[in-house]
Design a protein with these regions (language model features):
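Catalytic core of soluble alpha/beta enzymes
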Residues: 110-253, 272-275, 280
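Hydrophobic faces of well-ordered beta-strands that scaffold small-molecule active sites
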Residues: 13, 39-43, 74-83, 101-105, ...
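Short, charged beta->alpha transition segments
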Residues: 65-68, 80-96, 110, 118-123
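Active-site mouth loops of central-metabolism enzymes
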Residues: 17-26, 74-90, 106-110, 137-144, ...
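Active-site- and interface-proximal helix/loop "cap" or "latch" segments in soluble metabolic
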Residues: 6, 47-73
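Glycine-rich, proline-tolerant flexible connector loops at the mouths of alpha/beta enzymes
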Residues: 42-52, 101-122
């Protein structure tokens, strides 16, 4: 049931969290955190998303803030996330993820080359050692030809999978056939979370692994249903959420994630400040499955400008009207 707009707005705060390194082209992550009867929750669709796409994110916020969810485990394993940085920054960056034995490495970033990607992945493999799991994420930026060429060069680093190497489901299916002999599984992320039909990629035989995110799929309950219907291994990941949204992801991961994989929920390490003093940071390679209590002084310290706050509150109002129909 959709709460009244007044209920959503009664304890709602817009924050702008500074990031240690540029990620997804941004250096500040804006989010709206709000308090429901079940606890703090989050609404943080990326600013470029339209209201129709943002609607799932509001459903997720309501699902987590207005419904009770029991933790299915005490903690979940998480991966380190390596942005498109130079190899000499890799060791310091990985040190922010103590105990993590899986790393996700961003590749195909605009302005970088495949040589840059190879050097970065090689350094991650060197620092973490031969037994660690290394995955790459291209965010759909390669063509089929570029992806095939890049993955041929990256395959010797023993990749756990390549996440969203190409943008469309037909491209993923074509690439998967073409590189079948390489031993690099394909994972789908954008093809799940940005699709009107998140299971199309599974039916098309276009992926070996699904990456699922709580907010874009409409919340824990909706995402769990996608996982159950997919029939593929699933990895739960963050949408660069604050620690509040990471808590939502951790609840989902504890319930729905395939064993043997680490969740992409260690991303609080990418912020210089968060909404809670007890941020959901990785310890011994894991994050706890718990609701995060927000600190009022951090809400104040990280408050977005009045203009940005007004923009987010207007967006919340429009998306609420869309869901209220």
């Amino acid at each position: 049931v959709l709460p009244d707009l007044d209920d959503l707005l009664s304890d709602a705060h817009v924050v702008a969290l500074p990031m240690r390194v540029r990620f997804r082209g941004i250096t500040v992550r804006e989010a709206l955190v709000l308090r429901g009867p079940a606890g703090w929750t989050e609404f943080s669709p990326f600013v470029e998303y339209d209201d129709a796409e943002a609607a799932a994110w509001l459903r997720a916020a309501v699902d987590f803030g207005w419904a009770t969810h029991e933790p299915a485990a005490d903690s979940v394993p998480v991966n380190a996330t390596v942005p498109a940085i130079a190899p000499d920054g890799v060791a310091d960056l990985l040190a922010r993820y103590p105990g993590c034995t899986t790393a996700k490495v961003k590749v195909a970033e605009p302005g970088t080359t495949i040589d840059d990607d190879v050097a970065r992945v090689a350094e991650v493999r060197r620092v973490l050692g031969p037994s660690a799991a290394v995955r790459v994420d291209a965010n759909g930026l390669w063509s089929v030809d570029s992806a095939a060429e890049a993955l041929e060069r990256l395959a010797p680093f023993d990749l756990q999978y390549a996440e969203q190497p190409c943008r469309t489901v037909p491209e993923l299916a074509e690439l998967r056939q073409r590189i079948a002999g390489l031993g690099v599984p394909i994972a789908a992320d954008e093809s799940v979370r940005k699709a009107s039909d998140p299971l199309a990629v599974a039916r098309a035989g276009a992926a070996d692994v699904l990456v699922v995110k709580a907010q874009p799929l409409g919340g824990i309950t909706a995402a769990r249903a996608v996982v159950a219907d997919a029939g593929l291994p699933c990895v739960v990941s963050s949408a660069l959420d604050t620690s509040v949204g990471l808590g939502m992801g951790a609840f989902l991961a504890a319930e729905a994630m395939s064993p043997g994989y680490a969740a992409g929920l260690g991303t609080a390490a990418m912020f210089t400040s968060d909404v809670s003093a007890a941020a959901l940071l990785p310890v011994d390679g894991r994050v706890p499955v718990r609701r995060v209590e927000v600190d009022r002084d951090l809400l104040e310290r990280n408050a977005a400008s009045p203009e940005r706050a007004a923009w987010w509150l207007a967006r919340l109002e429009r998306v609420h009207a869309l869901l209220a129909g």
